[in-house]
């Protein structure tokens, strides 16, 4: 056996060397195929970073980025000392943390349930139903939510009341999170469903023969098969804890629910585009990005500690 392994190693090294030599010889071809992606990344990801200088300047449209006077960390001090800072920050954190706690397990549960459906025809129909909401745009979804929860909407008719749910700050987070779960949970379960399809059938059969009940089969056979996918998805979602989209929150906002619906991204939109305070809004956006990076590194570190060194 050792002889076979020793013979295999040089072959593997030779194969790798051949690949490297081929790439070096045909580097123009690889560069040709990589160029569109590289250009798009540079133009839309890296070049706009020059605009971050606005966060440290008293930006003037006429003078431009290079001609505007430097103010240093003034905008950051102004934002952090603002009486509304903690309210906007907590609104943002509550939405994303509650969404993560309630929304993250749902795709996993859906995938586990889908894995239990034996008839292919029924399984495809169920998949179609749970995948469809993902293709509804955010604005259309918000319109549907407003119609459903209006004082004369279906929900109030069913309950026999005439409550305007969209004006209640206490109901905003539930509406936001529940509608998000309905829209994205089915589509998010695809990766888990694909991973479960590759789970060892022999192991499942052995567990059944050993007398394992349904919960034991899920805990000891199916969940370990998708553990790596769960870890990666959790890290990615936790890393975006401050990057909650402004479109949905803005579309569901009313004057009455602002105490709960005004988040950092809607605040940036209001002071940046509506009030024209570009430097201040850029500083708030940069604050968001820095917190995201810190949280991503921290969550990845925690997951590695809890998962035997496995993370991103």
Describe each model-derived feature in a short phrase:
Residues 22, 26-312:
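A structural signal for multi-pass alpha-helical bundles of membrane permease subunits
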Residues 1-23:
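Short, Lys/Arg-rich, polar N-terminal cytosolic tail immediately upstream
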């Amino acid at each position: 056996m050792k002889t076979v392994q020793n013979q295999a190693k040089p072959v593997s090294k030779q194969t790798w060397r051949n690949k490297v030599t081929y790439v070096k010889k045909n580097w123009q071809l690889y560069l040709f195929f990589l160029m569109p992606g590289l250009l798009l990344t540079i133009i839309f990801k890296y070049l706009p970073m020059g605009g971050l200088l606005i966060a440290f300047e008293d930006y003037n449209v006429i003078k431009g980025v290079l001609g505007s006077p430097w103010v240093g960390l003034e905008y950051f001090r102004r934002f952090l000392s603002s009486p509304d800072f903690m309210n906007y920050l907590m609104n943002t954190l509550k939405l994303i943390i509650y969404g993560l706690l309630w929304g993250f397990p749902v795709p996993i549960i859906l995938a586990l349930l889908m894995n239990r459906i034996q008839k292919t025809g029924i399984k495809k129909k169920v998949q179609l139903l749970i995948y469809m909401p993902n293709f509804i745009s955010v604005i259309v979804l918000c319109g549907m939510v407003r119609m459903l929860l209006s004082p004369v909407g279906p929900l109030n008719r069913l309950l026999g009341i005439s409550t305007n749910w969209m004006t209640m700050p206490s109901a905003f987070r539930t509406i936001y999170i529940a509608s998000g779960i309905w829209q994205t949970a089915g589509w998010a379960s695809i990766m888990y469903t694909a991973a479960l399809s590759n789970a060892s059938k022999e192991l499942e059969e052995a567990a059944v023969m050993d007398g394992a009940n349904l919960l034991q089969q899920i805990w000891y056979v199916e969940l370990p098969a998708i553990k790596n996918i769960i870890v990666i998805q959790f890290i990615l979602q936790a890393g975006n804890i401050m990057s909650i989209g402004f479109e949905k929150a803005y579309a569901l906002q009313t004057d009455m629910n602002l105490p709960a619906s005004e988040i950092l991204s809607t605040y940036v939109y209001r002071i940046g585009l509506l009030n024209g305070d570009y430097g201040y809004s850029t500083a708030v956006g940069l604050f968001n990005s820095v917190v995201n990076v810190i949280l991503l590194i921290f969550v990845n570190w925690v997951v590695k500690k809890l998962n035997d060194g496995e993370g991103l």
